[in-house]
Amino acid sequence: MANRGPSYGLSREVQQKIEKQYDADLEQILIQWITTQCREDVGQPQPGRENFQKWLKDGTVLCKLINSLYPEGQAPVKKIQASSMAFKQMEQISQFLQAAERYGINTTDIFQTVDLWEGKNMACVQRTLMNLGGLAVARDDGLFSGDPNWFPKKSKENPRNFSDNQLQEGKNVIGLQMGTNRGASQAGMTGYGMPRQIL
């Protein structure tokens, strides 16, 4: 966790909430997908959040992952270099994030560099990788490797085309929100404040 000291009070509660969101089962799925997708020796970390963070921390695995989702010769990250220097590692992580955004991931679904590098929010890192995998499956361009069932299926556009006659008929239908004109009614009820007539 880099050079930060322990957090106390509200900061500690917030950090504990973030740490509870981390999914160990999802970690194993992501590791399996990354090693299958990269098709080269990227290693495999021991189970656990800290080991997962150390595996991805220098950005080389992430850059190899995003490059594997593009056709040969169109890789977005040109130079991937393992380095022990902090700013080089953070630069590679940010290159991955920029490439992921160009690939189609929403800006709101992308983690920040410090979330991974300092290990502050590994659940957010998992969400970004899940979205990337789901988007790769949805593209169906033949570059995805692995089991498509590992990721949630993205919805596809399914437009409905109605004729003018169908649209006109729809205007005549009484919607269920309006109630019904059949069944029980208030017919025969006395007005408000009148005594009940029991015979």
From Swiss-Prot:
Modified residues (Phosphothreonine): 180
Superkingdom: Eukaryota
Protein name: Transgelin-2
Keyword tags: Acetylation, Isopeptide bond, Methylation, Phosphoprotein, Ubl conjugation
Residues annotated with N-acetylalanine modification: 2
Modified residues (Omega-N-methylarginine): 182, 196
Residue ranges of every copy of the Calponin-homology (CH) domain listed in the record: 24-136
Keyword Phosphoprotein annotated: yes
Positions bearing N6-acetyllysine: 17, 20
